[in-house]
């Protein structure tokens, strides 16, 4: 039978990771099926989108509180759909406050994975216990994260970041300027407001 993967990705960065994850799994399991919360890159990679990844793109206390009832309803709805669809594994990509709570509810009914570790090694290390209770495996972007989880007896694997193979360590500045049609000697200021719609709107108000 084909491998079935339930998946929830939040915002643009999760969509990028999710698309690479789908491609990597399909390289080993060509018939694998993916469904859940997905962005445009994941959809293009073959994921069936029940909801858009933009539904989880909230940040900051005020914005989270404003959307909390909607997020709770979404989590209950996803739990019911995943239980009905019965995937072999649930993979939460980033969005730890949402995905770990969902994973805790699904664990036992299916295997659960958290792809992208919360920065638990930097602050509130006590959260590692709830992470272990929520997922069967953590997929880590950074090598020292796996060592941290090893010390706390939480199963983890270092997988790296897919963009590390696509972005060179040494950037050819002249080539980059040519690609962006920028004058060679001009001063360039990059404006990087973020990937969340609420973040862009808030920072662009003035």
Tell where the protein language model's regions lie, with residue ranges.
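Phosphate-coordination loops involved in phosphoryl transfer and adenosine-cofactor binding
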Residues: 2, 183-186
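Active-site and donor-binding regions of nucleotide-sugar-utilizing enzymes
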Residues: 3-177, 192-204
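Short active-site neighborhood of thiol/selenol oxidoreductases, capturing the structured segment around
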Residues: 189
């Amino acid at each position: 039978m084909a491998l079935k993967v339930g998946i929830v990705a939040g915002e643009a960065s999760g969509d990028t990771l999710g698309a690479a994850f789908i491609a990597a799994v399909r390289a080993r399991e060509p018939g694998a099926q993916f469904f859940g919360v997905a962005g445009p890159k994941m959809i293009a990679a073959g994921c069936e989108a029940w909801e858009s990844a933009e539904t989880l793109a909230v940040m900051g206390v005020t914005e989270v509180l404003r959307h909390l009832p909607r997020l709770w309803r979404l989590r209950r709805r996803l739990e019911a759909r995943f239980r009905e669809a019965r995937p072999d594994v649930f993979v939460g990509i980033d969005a730890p406050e949402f995905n770990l709570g969902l994973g805790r509810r699904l664990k036992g009914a299916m295997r659960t994975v958290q792809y992208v570790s919360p920065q638990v090694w930097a602050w509130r290390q006590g959260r590692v216990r709830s992470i272990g209770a929520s997922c069967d495996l953590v997929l880590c972007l950074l090598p020292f994260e796996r060592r941290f989880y090893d010390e706390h007896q939480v199963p983890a694997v270092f997988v790296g970041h897919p963009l590390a193979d696509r972005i060179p360590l040494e950037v050819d500045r002249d080539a980059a300027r040519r690609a962006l049609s920028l004058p060679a000697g001009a001063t360039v200021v990059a404006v990087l407001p973020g990937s969340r719609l609420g973040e862009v709107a808030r920072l662009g108000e003035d």
